[in-house]
Amino acid sequence: MPIQVLPPQLANQIAAGEVVERPASVVKELVENSLDAGATRIDIDIERGGAKLIRIRDNGCGIKKDELALALARHATSKIASLDDLEAIISLGFRGEALASISSVSRLTLTSRTAEQQEAWQAYAEGRDMNVTVKPAAHPVGTTLEVLDLFYNTPARRKFLRTEKTEFNHIDEIIRRIALARFDVTINLSHNGKIVRQYRAVPEGGQKERRLGAICGTAFLEQALAIEWQHGDLTLRGWVADPNHTTPALAEIQYCYVNGRMMRDRLINHAIRQACEDKLGADQQPAFVLYLEIDPHQVDVNVHPAKHEVRFHQSRLVHDFIYQGVLSVLQQQLETPLPLDDEPQPAPRSIPENRVAAGRNHFAEPAAREPVAPRYTPAPASGSRPAAPWPNAQPGYQKQQGEVYRQLLQTPAPMQKLKAPEPQEPALAANSQSFGRVLTIVHSDCALLERDGNISLLSLPVAERWLRQAQLTPGEAPVCAQPLLIPLRLKVSAEEKSALEKAQSALAELGIDFQSDAQHVTIRAVPLPLRQQNLQILIPELIGYLAKQSVFEPGNIAQWIARNLMSEHAQWSMAQAITLLADVERLCPQLVKTPPGGLLQSVDLHPAIKALKDE
């Protein structure tokens, strides 16, 4: 068969395989188009679970007559025009594929009118070449899209549709998610002529909890803890259910949004789960409705056909920001304010200084130029004081080249109130969970830390060595071996070959796999920490070490390897130090409680402070 260009209808049907999975996919794409058009009211009519009819009507800006035909063409869109726009997407749609794909697998009619036009126009595509016909029609300002007989021309796809009830439940769930994303839009959903959902728009400063309760239920609303956590252009808002009262029914409520776009993102879910892990059982899941706002330049939404996933350029910082925001709310809930004097006074509940964990406490205070203090309040019941107006009708966007991420490493420590003198704890008490907050890098390989007002210096190469030893030491299961693309073949002596054969089982537990013959050994796999090392130097040194040993313990071999690994960083940065200490705290908690020699050294500032005061 010769190479040929596919007919437009066939090409659109192939694209529809990714965009149009079921009727709910059609509803999602069309409602998002309405939101991009600035609609404040959207009416959705469904018949037979969407298989017979999907009708979306909005009061948005409409489409001009001259652009109706283009609206049904592939890769035609008004939302982006250049590569710069693609790298900072602020609209929900941007590819220009949805209408063309939907019209290729259904009978689609598009009717629209702009405020400048005296009459509306209707367009539909038909035939093998998808030729568009435009004719006048009666319609108010806005757009109506009718999708009839979905998959009528692709029987195999139609056969895979579920029951009418199941398909409508999927549509209902999509509308729930969209209604939680846009409190400022009225959304009405009807099925087979009966109104099923009515979500009225919440006015500016109105009660979002009313819609939250209608969608997520009163049980979630009663346990919801409100979050507002901000640093520069990073903002986290929403609600998380109290983990102490989470039920299996509540755990099904997991909604997250990035710049107003509904997401199922593993990084966000992991950060929330990690913040709640101390209070959740092994088989429990947190319940949350969270909104993350981030500079569009720092997130890529063009990584999934249905746009369900995103990729953050600074994923570690986003993860720690979300983790700290959720953790602070949960910690604040457990706190009881202490009276400052004998008279009872109302104590405002403010967020304490973030848990001093490496890489997780740079969000304690907002950036200096934007002094917006994070706050925590339990979600009020309907009728209480108004909440802040979010999410906004139009997503706010400023073209900034990632300054927030540099500011994250320069955030000043929060000011502490003066308290009565208390007995000083050692720099690392037995109940400490963290080395402290990284202030700066000293002499290229030492981190200056602060915890509870105490200053200390930490050797980053030593911490890295302990981390590598923990990563190499086998636990209940052997260390995972990483096959080498090009196996390393080395010549060995009879003594070295004998030592390797005796140590083979111990090396296998460390993830080192090899084969030997008469005078050579071939290294086929090594553990992950060794992949970036110069194995032509390290492996011969390891063989020489083994030849001098009589007992081969995996722990001793792991210790030797860790001490002989070359550091990955000749000059450490703040971000690298933060990442390293976060990993050390997770994998080597014993080092926090009892740091070994050469790792941590306290710095006594009292002589310097005294000298300053005596001047």
Swiss-Prot record:
Residues 363-397 are annotated as: Disordered. It comes from the Bacteria. PROSITE patterns: DNA_MISMATCH_REPAIR_1. This protein is involved in the repair of mismatches in DNA. It is required for dam-dependent methyl-directed DNA mismatch repair. May act as a 'molecular matchmaker', a protein that promotes the formation of a stable complex between two or more DNA-binding proteins in an ATP-dependent manner without itself being part of the final effector complex. The ATPase activity of MutL is stimulated by DNA. Residues 364-391 have a biased composition (Low complexity). The gene is mutL. SUPFAM superfamilies: ATPase domain of HSP90 chaperone/DNA topoisomerase II/histidine kinase, DNA mismatch repair protein MutL, Ribosomal protein S5 domain 2-like. InterPro entries: DNA_mismatch_repair_CS, DNA_mismatch_repair_MutL, DNA_mismatch_S5_2-like, HATPase_C_sf, MutL/Mlh/PMS, MutL/Mlh/Pms-like, MutL_C, MutL_C_dimsub. This is DNA mismatch repair protein MutL. HAMAP family: DNA_mis_repair. Signal peptide: none annotated.
